[in-house]
Amino acid sequence: GAYLRNDNYQNVIEEIYELFPILRKKKYQLVGELSGGQRQQVALGRALMIKPSVLMLDEPTAGVSPIVMDELFDHIIKVKRTNVAILMVEQNAKQALSISDRGYVLVTGENRYSGTGKELLNDSRVRSSFLGG
């Protein structure tokens, strides 16, 4: 990895298992045998192992079913509660804004709208153009 740990990482692993309990049950299973949502949890857990202050997520729900998407957003909320700042790019704007402290809507690569997640969800221009009404 990019950063090698010299401390006892067992405590960090325990924190990851508390965030993602299914991973404890699947710890002896190969990652390739896990579901898409479980693999995303492994990816989040790996990123959290270095105790980052900022976590960057690029389309974390891409290619997963709606049920798994809801589960992943629940996990992102759990990570947010650990005081890790999250910078996320996400096509599912409505759900992403619903959990965001701050949001930016880009149009052809330029920032068109910004505000709190709640402000953007309530902005009629954002709703009609990007959130389906």
Model-derived segments and their meaning:
Residues G1-N11, L19-P21, G133:
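ABC-type ATPase nucleotide-binding domains, specifically the catalytic core motifs of the NBD
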Residues L30-L34:
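Conserved ABC ATPase signature
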Residues L44:
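Hydrophobic anchor residue at the start of the ABC signature
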Residues A47-L48:
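ABC ATPase C-loop
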Residues K51:
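Conserved catalytic motifs of ABC-family nucleotide-binding domains
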Residues L55-E59:
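Catalytic Walker B motif of ABC-type/P-loop ATPase nucleotide-binding domains
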Residues D70-T82:
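Helical segment within the ABC ATPase nucleotide-binding domain
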